[in-house]
Swiss-Prot record:
The keyword tRNA-binding does not apply. This is Argininosuccinate synthase. Its EC number is 6.3.4.5. HAMAP family: Arg_succ_synth_type1. Keywords: Amino-acid biosynthesis, Arginine biosynthesis, ATP-binding, Cytoplasm, Ligase, Nucleotide-binding. Homotetramer. L-aspartate binds at residues 128, 132-133. Pathway: Amino-acid biosynthesis; L-arginine biosynthesis; L-arginine from L-ornithine and carbamoyl phosphate: step 2/3. One of its GO terms (molecular function) is argininosuccinate synthase activity. InterPro entries: Arginosuc_syn_C (IPR048268), Arginosuc_syn_N (IPR048267), Arginosuc_synth (IPR001518), Arginosuc_synth_CS (IPR018223), Arginosuc_synth_type_1_subfam (IPR023434), AS_cat/multimer_dom_body (IPR024074), Rossmann-like_a/b/a_fold (IPR014729). GO terms for biological process: argininosuccinate metabolic process; L-arginine biosynthetic process; urea cycle.
Amino acid sequence: MSNETKKTGVKKVVLAYSGGLDTSAIIPWLKETYDNCEIIAFCADVGQGDAELEGLHEKAISSGASECYIVDLKEELVADYIYPTIATGAIYEGTYLLGTSMARPIIAKAQVEVARKVGADAVCHGCTGKGNDQVRFEGCFAALAPDLKVIAPWREWEMVSREDLLDYLAERNIETTSSVTKIYSRDANAWHISHEGGELEDPWNEPTKGVWTMTVAPEDAPNEPEYVSLELEQGKITKVNGASLSPYGALTVLNEIAGAHGVGRIDITENRLVGMKSRGCYETPGGTVMFAALRAIEELVLDKSSREWREQIGAQMAHLVYDGRWFTPLCESLLAASIPLANLVSGEVVIKLYKGQAHAVKKRSENSLYSEEFATFGEDDVYNQKDAEGFIRLYSLASRIRALKAK
């Protein structure tokens, strides 16, 4: 593209950069599309692993960026985004623990902060025009920095396939580790990894062993169960097997332990925000254990009405997080409403891991409402069973009146 036909009005743009095929192509495309535009690469370290970050700065510079900021967000992600979300019990369509969805708000927020720091007038992402992430990122940008221009190359350029991107980079002598044989689209963070694309797009194809990366196949997991002891304080895991750990530290340990037992795999066809269905294979080993532990203590400490309210919050929260509406008054309100309930979730849980399953087999809490004296079927001095008669008569009064009226 000649200088005469290049777009103007953008002098400095911050790109959400991963070093993958898409964002590697975006850097030269931005330089060729916008006149005299400086590209700043931004990478969020959300626990995707050292292999994903190694050499990233050099790669961004060699692709044409003037600078690359790598921001460590691991602890903040777990403490300020994951824990508040799972405290509500949010789980999308009954199975998905929102791994990708929870990471998007903190990434977008940090990207805006870098844009402000360097004086950028635009932000850019590599999300496709068919997916949820474009909505999540741009919804966050709208809430946090409505003055910044948003550039979404997948909705602008003429490239439509991985082959197109590979050819584009080859023509410009930009190296990439991607290839047409690397068929899966993966997204990893401290909480999970997702796998999409390739043969997974046909729901009749069973995922091969090569799909999964965080967990062993349940049938190949140890033949003996492993018991993991967890201590919780106000809805957060503070100790794993007696060792005090940070929020991120606890999650990484549980990922390793639970992954070795094949825990946390799901294969689902979900309803995307943009209207289509998509198939995703997700691995959330440590998160599955954490979710089970919180729900186990909740069973002890929440009364019936509180638990029903928490379930309502969780159902609404799952949609807000999935749909990219984290920075909204409603999301803020639901998170605030869940805090008094989460503050009760303190205690100890023992989780049994075996062949892909994670079950709470022991639990106790100083806040427990469970009383063996009250619950026993044997003789007791604290509960007069005759009292139930009056309660049942009043509880069923509406049904009795309706039946009498029907005669």
